[in-house]
Amino acid sequence: MNLILMGLPGAGKGTQAEQIVAKYNIPHISTGDMFRAAMKAETEMGLQAKSFIDKGALVPDEVTIGIVRERLSQEDCVRGFLLDGFPRTVAQASALEEIMKDLGKKIDYVLNINVDSGLLLKRLTGRRICKECGATYHLEFNAPAKADVCDKCGGELYQRSDDNEETVANRLDVNIKQTKPLLDFYEELGYLQSINGEQDINKVFADIDVLIGGLA
C-alpha cells in the first residue's frame, strides 16, 4: 500500500501515522527523516542537499525529488510506504507520479485528515507548556488539575508565542492556500480520500483502517 498523508497543523497526522505504520508494518517516510538519512548515508542526492543546507540555502526541487526517488527505491518500501510532508506542491506531485511510474508502482490513496479550521485554532491555541520540566498540557483536552500549574513539578505553565491566536490563524490560512491546489490535483487523479478528523482518535483510525485494509 502506497499512501500519502495530508492534513493541516493540529489535524492529528502524527497520531494516525503511528497507528498506520504499527498495524501495516510499512515505513513512515517524513521529509525531515528522509533528508537526514540521505545526508548521513552520503548518497549522491544527500551530499547535494547538504551543500545547500550548509550554505543556508533552500534545497531545490530536483534534489528533494532525487532524495524521494532514492528513498522509495529502498527495500523496505517494496510492500508500501506512508509519505508525510511530501509532496508540498503540484510540481512535486507530478514528479512523484513519474517516480512511481519508473518504479512500476502507483499511489493508492491520499488520505486528507479534515478538521474545521475553527476547531484547529482551538486545538493549537490551547497548548500550555511547563517552564520548569517542559511537560505539555491542553486547556481543553489535557488540562492540569490546577490552572496554570504543572501536575508533575508544580512549575508555571505558559503559552508559546507562536501558539497565540493571531499567529496560529495566519499559519492555518497560509497552509490552506498552499494545500488547495495539491488536493485538487489528487482529486482529479481519483486518489483523494477525505477522513473526518473531528472524531475520537480511535474512530479516525477505524475509518482509515476500513479504507486501506483491502490494500494489505
UniProtKB/Swiss-Prot annotation:
<feature type="binding site">
    <location>
        <position position="31"/>
    </location>
    <ligand>
        <name>AMP</name>
    </ligand>
</feature>
<keyword id="KW-0808">Transferase</keyword>
<dbReference type="InterPro" id="IPR033690">
    <property type="entry name" value="Adenylat_kinase_CS"/>
</dbReference>
<feature type="binding site">
    <location>
        <begin position="57"/>
        <end position="59"/>
    </location>
    <ligand>
        <name>AMP</name>
    </ligand>
</feature>
<comment type="similarity">
    <text>Belongs to the adenylate kinase family.</text>
</comment>
<dbReference type="InterPro" id="IPR027417">
    <property type="entry name" value="P-loop_NTPase"/>
</dbReference>
<keyword id="KW-0479">Metal-binding</keyword>
<feature type="binding site">
    <location>
        <begin position="85"/>
        <end position="88"/>
    </location>
    <ligand>
        <name>AMP</name>
    </ligand>
</feature>
<feature type="binding site">
    <location>
        <position position="92"/>
    </location>
    <ligand>
        <name>AMP</name>
    </ligand>
</feature>
<keyword id="KW-0862">Zinc</keyword>
<keyword id="KW-0067">ATP-binding</keyword>
<feature type="region of interest" description="LID">
    <location>
        <begin position="126"/>
        <end position="163"/>
    </location>
</feature>
<comment type="pathway">
    <text>Purine metabolism; AMP biosynthesis via salvage pathway; AMP from ADP: step 1/1.</text>
</comment>
<feature type="binding site">
    <location>
        <position position="153"/>
    </location>
    <ligand>
        <name>Zn(2+)</name>
    </ligand>
</feature>
<feature type="binding site">
    <location>
        <position position="36"/>
    </location>
    <ligand>
        <name>AMP</name>
    </ligand>
</feature>
<dbReference type="GO" id="GO:0005737">
    <property type="term" value="C:cytoplasm"/>
</dbReference>
<feature type="binding site">
    <location>
        <position position="133"/>
    </location>
    <ligand>
        <name>Zn(2+)</name>
    </ligand>
</feature>
<dbReference type="GO" id="GO:0044209">
    <property type="term" value="P:AMP salvage"/>
</dbReference>
<keyword id="KW-0545">Nucleotide biosynthesis</keyword>
<dbReference type="InterPro" id="IPR006259">
    <property type="entry name" value="Adenyl_kin_sub"/>
</dbReference>
<feature type="region of interest" description="NMP">
    <location>
        <begin position="30"/>
        <end position="59"/>
    </location>
</feature>
<dbReference type="Pfam" id="PF00406">
    <property type="entry name" value="ADK"/>
</dbReference>
<feature type="binding site">
    <location>
        <position position="150"/>
    </location>
    <ligand>
        <name>Zn(2+)</name>
    </ligand>
</feature>
<dbReference type="GO" id="GO:0005524">
    <property type="term" value="F:ATP binding"/>
</dbReference>
<keyword id="KW-0547">Nucleotide-binding</keyword>
<keyword id="KW-0963">Cytoplasm</keyword>
<keyword id="KW-0418">Kinase</keyword>
<feature type="binding site">
    <location>
        <position position="171"/>
    </location>
    <ligand>
        <name>AMP</name>
    </ligand>
</feature>
<dbReference type="Pfam" id="PF05191">
    <property type="entry name" value="ADK_lid"/>
</dbReference>
<dbReference type="InterPro" id="IPR007862">
    <property type="entry name" value="Adenylate_kinase_lid-dom"/>
</dbReference>
<dbReference type="GO" id="GO:0004017">
    <property type="term" value="F:adenylate kinase activity"/>
</dbReference>
<feature type="binding site">
    <location>
        <position position="130"/>
    </location>
    <ligand>
        <name>Zn(2+)</name>
    </ligand>
</feature>
<dbReference type="GO" id="GO:0008270">
    <property type="term" value="F:zinc ion binding"/>
</dbReference>
<protein>
    <recommendedName>
        <fullName>Adenylate kinase</fullName>
        <ecNumber>2.7.4.3</ecNumber>
    </recommendedName>
</protein>
<dbReference type="InterPro" id="IPR000850">
    <property type="entry name" value="Adenylat/UMP-CMP_kin"/>
</dbReference>
<feature type="binding site">
    <location>
        <position position="127"/>
    </location>
    <ligand>
        <name>ATP</name>
    </ligand>
</feature>
<feature type="binding site">
    <location>
        <position position="160"/>
    </location>
    <ligand>
        <name>AMP</name>
    </ligand>
</feature>
<comment type="function">
    <text>Catalyzes the reversible transfer of the terminal phosphate group between ATP and AMP. Plays an important role in cellular energy homeostasis and in adenine nucleotide metabolism.</text>
</comment>
<feature type="binding site">
    <location>
        <position position="199"/>
    </location>
    <ligand>
        <name>ATP</name>
    </ligand>
</feature>
<feature type="binding site">
    <location>
        <begin position="136"/>
        <end position="137"/>
    </location>
    <ligand>
        <name>ATP</name>
    </ligand>
</feature>
<feature type="binding site">
    <location>
        <begin position="10"/>
        <end position="15"/>
    </location>
    <ligand>
        <name>ATP</name>
    </ligand>
</feature>
<comment type="subunit">
    <text>Monomer.</text>
</comment>
